[in-house]
Swiss-Prot record:
Keywords: Hydrolase, Metal-binding, Metalloprotease, Protease, Zinc. One of its GO terms (biological process) is proteolysis. Zn(2+) binds at residues 80, 84, 160. One of its GO terms (cellular component) is outer membrane-bounded periplasmic space. The active site is at residue 83. One of its GO terms (molecular function) is zinc ion binding. Belongs to the peptidase M16 family. The gene is pqqL. Signal peptide: none annotated. InterPro entries: Metalloenz_LuxS/M16 (IPR011249), MPP/UQCRC_Complex (IPR050361), Pept_M16_N (IPR011765), Pept_M16_Zn_BS (IPR001431), Peptidase_M16_C (IPR007863). Its cofactor is Zn(2+). The keyword Isomerase does not apply. This is Probable zinc protease PqqL.
Amino acid sequence: MEIIMRNLCFLLTLVATLLLPGRLIAAALPQDEKLITGQLDNGLRYMIYPHAHPKDQVNLWLQIHTGSLQEEDNELGVAHFVEHMMFNGTKTWPGNKVIETFESMGLRFGRDVNAYTSYDETVYQVSLPTTQKQNLQQVMAIFSEWSNAATFEKLEVDAERGVITEEWRAHQDAKWRTSQARRPFLLANTRNLDREPIGLMDTVATVTPAQLRQFYQRWYQPNNMTFIVVGDIDSKEALALIKDNLSKLPANKAAENRVWPTKAENHLRFNIINDKENRVNGIALYYRLPMVQVNDEQSFIEQAEWSMLVQLFNQRLQERIQSGELKTISGGTARSVKIAPDYQSLFFRVNARDDNMQDAANALMAELATIDQHGFSAEELDDVKSTRLTWLKNAVDQQAERDLRMLTSRLASSSLNNTPFLSPEETYQLSKRLWQQITVQSLAEKWQQLRKNQDAFWEQMVNNEVAAKKALSPAAILALEKEYANKKLAAYVFPGRNLSLTVDADPQAEISSKETLAENLTSLTLSNGARVILAKSAGEEQKLQIIAVSNKGDLSFPAQQKSLIALANKAVSGSGVGELSSSSLKRWSAENSVTMSSKVSGMNTLLSVSARTNNPEPGFQLINQRITHSTINDNIWASLQNAQIQALKTLDQRPAEKFAQQMYETRYADDRTKLLQENQIAQFTAADALAADRQLFSSPADITFVIVGNVAEDKLVALITRYLGSIKHSDSPLAAGKPLTRATDNASVTVKEQNEPVAQVSQWKRYDSRTPVNLPTRMALDAFNVALAKDLRVNIREQASGAYSVSSRLSVDPQAKDISHLLAFTCQPERHDELLTLANEVMVKRLAKGISEQELNEYQQNVQRSLDIQQRSVQQLANTIVNSLIQYDDPAAWTEQEQLLKQMTVENVNTAVKQYLSHPVNTYTGVLLPK
């Protein structure tokens, strides 16, 4: 009886403790009800998630729950090598037959078919239409053979060694060197430290087919696999495909995936990364701590707290930079990154102005110490919570339109980490309820927990010897930390949010003309001269896309301004509009479900706004204000201007950028290709930048608004006339630009400044079309280029094992009336002449041969699939209309593409190709070689 009473008292005490304010029973999280999971008799797990966007498309992913972490010391790189070999022969599809089979279905390697190897997993991905049942069956048969019947023929293995070596070589850039210098600090005491997926090239050079097969048989077993199906497919059909093709795999057991717990490195470390190609100088503080796996409500809250701390830091830092309180740095960020299966890192970084490392260190120390002393305010936290809840509510409303690839990737992550897959609705409701327990006090406790963590290191990044000499010593950093810990700092005052966007629009504007261009495609001309193209998509998206296309771009400006126009546009776009600051605009945009972006090119500027069909007005308000009431933040401009000057000063230290600039100047005889001098950049004020940006949209008569979405025309017309028709002509209109003047002489550029053991080769051939290239001709050239790209891949990447990737790209300049072909690849330095000669021989042979019926059929399938997706996607359809307008001066040209596709013949394609691509007017060749 006494024991029973003691147990009862203990249970009552435990329950009372768990129910205290701020404490939470670890309740399980609910799985998305749409997700179907199960396991076959042989141990293979599956996940099926029906998702109708885009229509008739499905993603099929095979996830092997093993990556480079499971490699033995003599296998470093084998997991990645095995992944490559899946595309080099299976029992039924030997050699390149796997890739050829995919291509015969109209699928493109890279876009529709891909694979990757990470530390924890190896994943094979195929995306294809669900309407082609025979192809679905064949793809599933390939997945079955990837799972159990790869061949690892010696000839294929030997050929792939060079491909992997070139992949390794191609990635040895400044980013790679920085990563290598950081790894011993960031990944200390983790298995990840010496298990990079790319592996060791000694292993790649010597591993035998038998060793590859042994690794494959050890890990590629059903109980170590998950098959993921996401898309517009009936769940019963998906399950039948899985069972029919994967249930017959032998029920062999894979080796058990081992776990290596990360040990804390509990002492402060100091790192300096000195690389001339670093774009900025800066200082950062990294913390390492256990990863939060979100499995229950308590971990859901904890993960949100860490995430909110990062967002609060970033928000405050940006506010202080934009307000002018932090003029000693040019930017900064905080982020959280996964560094091992069980560990993460939170870091806080600021970028120095010029090479002032002391100022940067002071700024970061002050920010951290201010939070130490005062934490974050209730107003800041409420703002972050409100903004996040708005994003989550928008995700609920827009869940039917989730990106298919991102959705599949999230499911794969859930499978890998064995965590619940939450629906958007559950995520929103949980956040609304559980975030109430996240308070200023709980965040302060979390912050102090982080700051007391001894597993940390300071990192300074410098790009020149002056900055390196100014880098702080460990003793100086420790002294500065102590100084700021004892310094009394003022609390940060949150500026609040203005969420009112006042638009003074003229409701009297009229439509002066209307024309039907095609079915569901209408052209309007407004009384202010602006043109509007209205289109409806074939899908059911509740999205409205508005794109303002100006026929003014950076080529409309003189040489002494041209290279600053894109920078000015970036500064204006980041400064808010009208009465809304940049931060207030982000909150306003979230609450009204709108997004905005802009892009300046040579002859055009695009301003794109996305809104919702059930509330389109904010989208029109935003684009009106961006054109008529744009503004610029002086401090944002100063930061961007400083960064541009520093980039110019250090251009000689970045060979790849210097090489690209030299090639650009070589191809044109035009001062507008030249870089500006430091004093020219410095003299361009914020007011100059704002004036230049406003000139891009200075005349409504030079703007075409492309509007795509399923909204009633009468409703749209009222918004169009009010918000677009009220845009007035500027007092300082800008003339349309002129194409760059082409260089008339052939040229060759060789730069021996590369820091990596790799050659970068670029060859531009220019062809004079004399007359504008129409859509049928462009389609013929594209079909040819697809076949040429395949030839280059087979001959250079695979047979010659000479390059990791080979790029073949055709572009048409409608204003200059010329066609350019770019051939680009990276390779072993001593082979660049050999491989360039081979590439040109391949092109000559392909020109003589033309394309075949089979190749044309593959191209037609590929394009038809793109057209099907495009016409159901609001965003893609809007982009297609814009491209049609820019390339052919006809917003309806794209409507002929499907019919033209059917009319294409081998004879017509080959005739067009020989007419336009047989005789280049100029050839410009460039090679970037190691020092």
